[in-house]
């Protein structure tokens, strides 16, 4: 969970403890009796309760943690469960496992399912076949399989509050520290073509780092991502001029950029599309694509060994801040080393004024608008999950933020 340290930052003394400047005992958290937790915050934060459903905040059974030591959490028998279901037949290498109804769950009478069988299916075509055979009641499909099923009566589009985008390496000395080159890249990508022709799975073009379906801007009543969208999103002629001006500033006539992405079918297709789009529209540009296993691609990004990095983010809670904070200067997810005092200041002001919703969102909007001027990332398309769902399966909560919830699910 080290990559999520920042979500604790508003808890009293959390930052100082993380930096080794204060003792853990000074953390602004304490248990009052068996059923009450008191948390002291540095600043007001209306969405803090929403954050508490994230796994990073889950309580741990101290007795079991000490008992199992390094084995804790590596298999079902070394893990404690206090939710609707408890997991059985699982190890950290399992591709199949079962969740059975928890007899100690406080609202067990409202839970109709006795168990859920999970199966890892790496190929969408296989997932489709298993669904047709009746072996799966909820099957996630993507790529060409999803494209061919867009008119299927069992297909459900789950539009997540998430975006797929390209991180641009802006570190000191990197060629993309040049703003004109970054703006040229942004304006050269035909996102409509990407979503409709390449992905063709229900995805929609994305023009801001802030993902849709997180929250509405109280001033305009619009989805925050729509309210924050820049006016100009695609202009090839302008992109060429900016590109040539940027090259001139760097005393270059051509440029080689490396695009790092995972080796999933979707990321391969998106990588090829970006390579073609950028090379054909920006004179003197060569894009070398490196499709690697996700962990290997991430390691390169985390160590700054990329020019372009195809990535994504799903909001952890229903607030644009969830995503925007990942590009603050000190955030561990800021792989491209975006550095903007104005951007950071707006987020800081948002935190200080979080108790007043209108003021809070006005600062978030200004932060996104600042990013629109700086081009630290290339937003590409919104995140959609295509699910084949048993027509008799009811009561599932399809959350745009968070995980799919089967707590009250049942079969008709």
Where are these regions (language model features)?
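Gly/Pro-rich hinge or "lid" segments in bacterial periplasmic/extracellular proteins
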Residues: 12-16, 22-24, 41-111, 115, ...
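Alpha-helical secondary-structure segments
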Residues: 34-38, 114-115, 163-209, 255-265, ...
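Extracytoplasmic/peripheral linker and loop segments enriched in polar/acidic and small residues
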Residues: 21-25, 231, 284-297, 324-390, ...
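Ligand-site clamp/hinge motif
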Residues: 101-149
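Aromatic- and charge-enriched surface segment that lines or borders ligand/interaction sites
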Residues: 1-10, 38, 175-177
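Ligand/substrate-recognition segments at binding pockets and active sites
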Residues: 92-94, 236, 244-315, 330, ...
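Structural transition elements
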Residues: 204-245, 266-268
């Amino acid at each position: 969970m080290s990559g999520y340290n920042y979500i604790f930052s508003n808890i009293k003394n959390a930052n100082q403890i993380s930096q080794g400047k204060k003792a853990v005992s000074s953390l602004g958290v304490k248990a009052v009796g068996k059923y009450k937790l008191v948390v002291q915050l540095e600043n007001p934060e209306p969405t803090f309760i929403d954050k508490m459903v994230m796994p990073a905040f889950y309580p741990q059974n101290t007795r079991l943690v000490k008992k199992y030591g390094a084995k804790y959490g590596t298999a079902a028998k070394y893990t404690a469960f206090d939710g609707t279901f408890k997991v059985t037949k699982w190890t950290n290498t399992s591709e199949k496992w079962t969740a059975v109804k928890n007899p100690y769950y406080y609202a067990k009478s409202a839970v109709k399912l006795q168990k859920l069988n999970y199966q890892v299916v790496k190929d969408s075509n296989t997932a489709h076949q298993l669904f047709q055979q009746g072996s799966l009641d909820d099957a996630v499909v993507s790529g060409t399989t999803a494209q061919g099923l867009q008119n299927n009566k069992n297909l459900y589009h789950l539009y997540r509050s998430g975006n797929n985008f390209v991180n641009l390496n802006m570190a000191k000395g990197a060629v993309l520290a040049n703003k004109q080159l970054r703006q040229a890249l942004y304006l050269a990508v035909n996102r409509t073509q990407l979503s409709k022709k390449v992905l063709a799975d229900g995805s929609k073009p994305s023009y801001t780092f802030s993902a849709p379906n997180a929250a509405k801007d109280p001033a305009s009543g619009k989805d925050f991502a729509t309210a924050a969208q820049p006016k100009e999103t695609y202009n090839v002629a302008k992109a060429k001029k900016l590109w040539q001006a940027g090259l001139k500033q760097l005393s270059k006539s051509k440029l080689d950029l490396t695009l790092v992405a995972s080796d999933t079918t979707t990321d391969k297709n998106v990588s090829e599309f970006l390579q073609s789009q950028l090379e054909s529209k920006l004179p003197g540009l060569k894009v070398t694509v490196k499709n690697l296993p996700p962990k290997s691609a991430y390691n390169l990004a985390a160590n700054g060994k990329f020019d372009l990095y195809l990535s994504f983010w799903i909001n952890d809670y229903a607030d644009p801040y969830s995503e925007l904070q990942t590009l603050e200067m000190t955030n561990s997810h800021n792989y491209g080393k975006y550095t903007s005092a104005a951007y950071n200041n707006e987020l800081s002001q948002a935190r200080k004024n979080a108790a007043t919703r209108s003021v809070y969102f006005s600062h978030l909007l200004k932060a996104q608008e600042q990013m629109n001027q700086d081009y630290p990332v290339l937003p590409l398309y919104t995140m959609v999950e295509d699910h084949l769902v048993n027509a008799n399966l009811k009561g599932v909560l399809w959350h745009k933020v968070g995980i799919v919830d089967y707590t009250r699910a049942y079969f008709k």
